C-alpha cells in the first residue's frame, strides 16, 4: 500500500468504483491531478477517484486533504492505467486521479452504493 493511501480498498469496492467511472463516462469527468485539484478547491466534484499506484505519491496527496476540508467523498482504485481505460482514455495513458462532476440518474444508485462501502 502506498504512502498516500489511507485505507486498503477491497477488490469488490474497487470494481464498483471502476463501474461507476464507466457509467459516468458520458457525463462530465475531469482527469489528471491539476484538473481534479481545481474542482476539489471549487467544491464542484461529486466524487473523486485516486489511483493507489501513483509514483511519486505527492502528485495526489494534497487532493485527499482538500476533499476532507470540502467534504468531497473520494475512493481509491489499484491501477492508474485501468482507471484511465475505464474513463475512456486512450490505451497506454494513465490517470492518477479523476473527478466525477455530474452523476447521471442511472448511475446515482451506484454512487450511493460506493459511498456506503467506503
Regions from the language model: what does each represent?
Residues 25, 51-52:
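A generic structural signal for short
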Residues 32, 48-50, 67:
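Structural signal for hydrophobic/aromatic residues that build the beta-strand cores
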Residues 44-47, 94-96:
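Short, surface-exposed beta-edge/turn micro-motifs
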Residues 60-61, 65-118:
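Short basic, glycine-rich beta-strand/loop surfaces that mediate nucleic-acid
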Residues 2-46:
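Ribosome large-subunit tunnel/peptidyl-transferase-proximal elements
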Amino acid at each position: 500500500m502506498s504512502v498516500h493511501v489511507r485505507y486498503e480498498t477491497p477488490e469488490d469496492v474497487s470494481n464498483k468504483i471502476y463501474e461507476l467511472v464507466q457509467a459516468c463516462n458520458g457525463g462530465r469527468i475531469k482527469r489528471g491531478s491539476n484538473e481534479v485539484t481545481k474542482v476539489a478547491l471549487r467544491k464542484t466534484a461529486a466524487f473523486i477517484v485516486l489511483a493507489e499506484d501513483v509514483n511519486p505519491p505527492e502528485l495526489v496527496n494534497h487532493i485527499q486533504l482538500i476533499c476532507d476540508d470540502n467534504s468531497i467523498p473520494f475512493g481509491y482504485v489499484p491501477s492508474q492505467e485501468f482507471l484511465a481505460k475505464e474513463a475512456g482514455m486512450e490505451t497506454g495513458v494513465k490517470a492518477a486521479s479523476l473527478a466525477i462532476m455530474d452523476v447521471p440518474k442511472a448511475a446515482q444508485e451506484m454512487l450511493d452504493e460506493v459511498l456506503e462501502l467506503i
